[in-house]
Amino acid sequence: MESRNEAYEGAYNATFWGDFSYHGYGFSEDGSKFCEQIPILVNSFGVWEKLDLPIRGMKIWDYSLPHLESVIVLVLCLWQFFYLSLKKIGLPVPKITSMMIAGAALSQTNLLPNDWTIQHILFPDDTRPKVPETLGGFAFVFYWFIEGVKMDVGMVRKTGTKVIVTGIATVILPIIAANMVFGKLRETGGKYLTGMEYRTILFMQSISAFTGISRLLRDLRINHSEFGRIVISTAMVADGTGFGVNLFALVAWMDWRVSALQGVGIIGYVIFMVWVVRPAMFWVIKRTPQERPVKECFIYIILILAFGGYYFLKEIHMFPAVGPFLLGLCVPHGPPLGSQLVEKFESFNTGILLPLFLFFSMLQIDGPWLANQIGQLRHFDGQLYEALTIIIVVFVAKIIFSMIPALLAKMPLTDSFVMALILSNKGIVELCYFLYGVESNVLHVKSFTIMATMILVSSTISPVLIHYLYDSSKRFISFQKRNLMSLKLGSELKFLVCIHKADHISGMINLLAQSFPLHESTISCYVIHLVELVGLDNPVFISHQMQKAEPGNRSYSNNVLIAFDNFKHYWKSISLELFTCISNPRYMHQEIYSLALDKQASFLMLPFHIIWSLDQTTVVSDDVMRRNANLNVLRQAPCSVGIFVHRQKLLSAQKSSPSFEVCAIFVGGKDDREALALGRQMMRNPNVNLTVLKLIPAKMDGMTTGWDQMLDSAEVKEVLRNNNNTVGQHSFVEYVEETVNDGSDTSTLLLSIANSFDLFVVGRSAGVGTDVVSALSEWTEFDELGVIGDLLVSQDFPRRGSVLVVQQQQNVACR
């Protein structure tokens, strides 16, 4: 017994016990034995550890949790530094590219001396658990699952023939061209790339990964344009074509037993997803009460299935990310399930965990070897030369064969080239595949160094080129005057009405019914229901037939459909069309621009972002995102815009009040003239009594002069001249002039008449720069309403009358 104890203590001496106590592991004196504490030490013993044992005590990042936190902070700060720096100098490099740059920047730190702190943090010894790398792998699986959830497979059914031809050509034809070149390269002595490496590089350069392209379009903010929709549809077709080519290659090049196993495995997995998992998800949605979240247990089951799919495809030797991606495709998009998954996990995964994966992936780049290969390029020799030959051939072929179908479809040359650039861009999808190739021993680390560098170059340069070649804002510039002033009397009046929430429906219907001559057949009304995009990757635009919606049907626009269907049923003479747009609030203005241009609308009505209770004393909803959407519309709308603030108890649209009192406040300027032009249109409704209140400052400083003053006078005279509709001795227009000294007088005057009118119409820029609003502008809370409009909706103002703030069309381009 004593001899055994002596042997034990001889093998494990005092040094070992010091290591074991603090490190959680230790080596015997001769280095032949290793002992580890289970479970491992996660946290340190505190700040006194190094003072207690200065030799044996660990550094704080030697423990798992502090080490993980150190790496997360380092990676976060580094990629944010690159992202913000590049953005500051005008280079719109995507966030994912910045994460890759951060990893590439520190990839050579493994060449530093071992006693450097950065070495201990980024390249720990093999005895320590790789917690950051493990979480990065977790993010890798999660990324593919979330991308599948956000993808709308239904878009494939809506693609046209030209899009399908472009998507197939941009994958198949570059592969054919590259095979021809590679054959010639082999004949002239190419010897560095193996056949499997060549096929892997060729395939990944030829495909157009939908998930990567969709993220690029989001980063460049062009996924909401018509051009963006075409590119997304083309990428979906190209991605499907690439998947088919991959399956064909597996059957042709691999052992038939392996191919059979993979074929049976993937078919069985798809059948299980479509016929078992997806119906189960619909069963979960059916059991979930409307407007309520899905139970957490179902969310966890789906996550387990995602990781199970990953490991299943890994076992049958297929790209494992396809497993969680296919599961994501099976998740019904939108609320409650799809949107809840995206809201719950995407931000954390993309912002915290995914940078770890990209960072550690790029750490594998061998910089010195790559520099040596670059030097060999002048001799037209080396592995880099062979790989670059394939990359350039496929890239050029992909650009050409992507542009030709687009040009034949009469797409502008610049747009065709930009689309080809987008389809040729490489990013996280390709990086994931090459990394999987290294882990599967299909690619050597040297080949991964080349391809990771090429992906980094592509994902850095392509977005910058696309940003400067394609200006999406130009797509929304009108070449004609689309405002009410330029509209001839008797011409068709085209409204575009925006609805954000169900609370806006009755207010907009009441405004239309009470204010405008709906009995005439010269009014067209286009209604767009704007729904926040959650749980989807790309916007959805739906054109509805005006048919009666079925109550109880769970639809995005069910309430809107029912309400406006009844509205059209009563006002049969009006032309009415309804649309639903599911979009990111930051880009909703682009959807509104597109529809306004397409329908040649003259006036666009937006609901105010604040909703009050019925007694007008409490704010029920204050949606900042909707406010930002309104502000974006005002900046570049292709027609005149009105922001409607509903502040009164609603009247029935079918039983109009005998008279509807409207006050048009006029100071001067183009917005006020547009407000008067709107008043002229309202005069065609026999139930409208219009009062034009002209505010004249005691001092004329800042007032319009010259041509603007003539236009102001002409518009007032036009309103009075058209006052020909009378019933007996009743006049429909009353013209009142009031002189005010300052903003205080204006406020007092408007307070005195607040309860006399049902609707106030005012220009957004009314009184700006004059004594009419002096001192009031300092208290303006909502810039989109202007100074007087903001006063009319303030807390101190009586809340009987609604307010319509008008802005005339801002931008008219010259051909």
Swiss-Prot record:
Gene Ontology terms describing biological process: potassium ion transport; proton transmembrane transport
Tissue: Preferentially expressed in pollen.
Transmembrane stretches, start-end: 71-91, 136-156, 163-183, 198-217, 230-250, 265-285, 298-318, 351-371, 388-408, 417-437, 450-470
MF annotations from Gene Ontology: antiporter activity
Intrachain S-S bonds: none
Pfam families from the UniProt entry: CHX17_2nd, CHX17_C, Na_H_Exchanger
Compartments, as annotated in UniProt: Membrane
Record has Translocase as a keyword: no
Record membrane topology: Multi-pass membrane protein
Record keywords, A-Z: Antiport, Ion transport, Membrane, Potassium, Potassium transport, Transmembrane, Transmembrane helix, Transport
GO CC list: membrane
Alphabetical list of InterPro entries matching this protein: Cation/H_exchanger_TM, CPA2_transporter, Na+/solute_symporter_sf
Gene3D superfamilies: 1.20.1530.20
Entry annotated with the keyword RNA-binding: no
Main subcellular location: membrane
Function noted in UniProt: May operate as a cation/H(+) antiporter.
Family statement drawn from the similarity comment of this UniProt entry: Belongs to the monovalent cation:proton antiporter 2 (CPA2) transporter (TC 2.A.37) family. CHX (TC 2.A.37.4) subfamily.
Protein name per Swiss-Prot or TrEMBL: Cation/H(+) antiporter 5
Organism name: Arabidopsis thaliana (Mouse-ear cress)
Record lineage: Eukaryota, Viridiplantae, Streptophyta, Embryophyta, Tracheophyta
